[in-house]
């Protein structure tokens, strides 16, 4: 029988193995989720909120342990893992506190009688999530659906099975009934089979563009609502009036975040030609000299990538970029020894037509561009198939907002890399996917917005 392994990317050690579930086992899990849904949806908001509050409390109490699990299972810096767990607790609390208000009936104006929208749960949701934020991704999917009254069957990435198992245990301990949230151990090849199950009513995926296209096709074939959060190639535009030191520090720290394995990481830094030489020099010193090492060491700035394969994929992209004419300013090599470590890397002179110009590089690679003016910066920022996030960095905030309005993405941050907060929607445009998660937008994705009209027999049709 095939198994799913969890491997420490800093050492290469196999930590644990889980047998893959059979189709019949998964079918039984879906049956339980469907059965639980019929009762869970009847619970009051306060009863469902209690589970979310408890989950938040448990996560905060165990943040050191859970943060360490992020480190040993996918290589995240321990302090970043702890911050991720704190964020998850905040998301659970946000929906516990606001769910009933957000889902209250919405009156509609009508000339006769009255009408309103009633927001109702739809059933079992299949959620397929990636490894780069092993607790945040599952929380982002679980919290709004649980408060709505849906149930979740979650397939986590194959390299973070312990995190997937742990989230189910946390929610059960928090008081969720069996079947409200169930983690499954299956390969990606089983997903379309699950989407064929008529008991599954909705589908959410965060992952690569090819995975998203396949997932959406399988969901669409079954006429099921889906949301996708896919790749990104976020631009970080530096305005001419920017504080250079702060701009460099913000861009570099944003790219070091999670070893560059973040969909909204500032992958393309776009700098006015007047600031470019100084920016490049400062960025090379700060980024190129980042301390690489053990994710559990508080002094480490750059942890390993999630796997040796992930590192080799990134290095291959860097090598191809250089072969196609890009300039390698710093890094570009693997670090010898155990683990999936590589040097922080800076590329410049990237031109349209090169693979690096259009592809997402999911690792610690900073691409820096020089432009003549802000019009050119906006054109470059938009010249991508992706449309997830982005940054405009400058002193004149009013002008920065004007530039932000011209960027074709789902999110733009002023003077900060694209971030995450429970009350703010998260999602993109173009090939970065569709739909939104978090905030009021996220809670409406998997509900039946039912119109209820009260009128009389003689009213107009």
Model region roles, listed by residue range:
Residues 12, 48, 70, 92, ...:
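Residue-level signal for inorganic ion chemistry
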Residues 105-246, 371:
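Rossmann-like NAD(P) dinucleotide-binding subdomain of oxidoreductase/dehydrogenase enzymes
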Residues 34-37, 41, 56-63, 67, ...:
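Structural signal for hydrophobic packing residues in well-ordered secondary-structure cores
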Residues 1-113:
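N-terminal Rossmann-like NAD(P)+-binding subdomain of aldehyde/semialdehyde dehydrogenases
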